[in-house]
UniProtKB/Swiss-Prot annotation:
The chain crosses the membrane at residues 1-21, 29-49, 61-81. Core subunit of the mitochondrial membrane respiratory chain NADH dehydrogenase (Complex I) which catalyzes electron transfer from NADH through the respiratory chain, using ubiquinone as an electron acceptor. Part of the enzyme membrane arm which is embedded in the lipid bilayer and involved in proton translocation. The gene is MT-ND4L. The lineage of its organism: Eukaryota, Metazoa, Chordata, Craniata, Vertebrata. It is found in: Mitochondrion inner membrane. It comes from Pusa caspica (Caspian seal). It comes from the Eukaryota. This is NADH-ubiquinone oxidoreductase chain 4L. GO terms for molecular function: NADH dehydrogenase (ubiquinone) activity. Belongs to the complex I subunit 4L family. Disulfide bonds: none annotated. One of its GO terms (cellular component) is mitochondrial inner membrane. GO terms for biological process: ATP synthesis coupled electron transport. It catalyses: a ubiquinone + NADH + 5 H(+)(in) = a ubiquinol + NAD(+) + 4 H(+)(out).
Amino acid sequence: MSMVYANIFLAFIMSLMGLLMYRSHLMSSLLCLEGMMLSLFVMMTATILNNHFTLASMAPIILLVFAACEAALGLSLLVTVSNTYGTDYVQNLNLLQC
């Protein structure tokens, strides 16, 4: 494994650890998810370019489309939660609480 792939994999792991550790606020969780999607995009693009997969050249674009949809839904959820509860705590999303 080259150093480029190791650094990209390390960025993915750091974003995953940030998502697992700092999950009190919704904004920090969304930021960690975006970091994970960015590292997946770079890893997929580098793999396709290095291995000359011409048929799979649309896969990073499709991943970016899904990342944009995920970001839009996450931000709309953030606005809804912050308007309803006044904060962006993730514990406000628990539907079982009274």
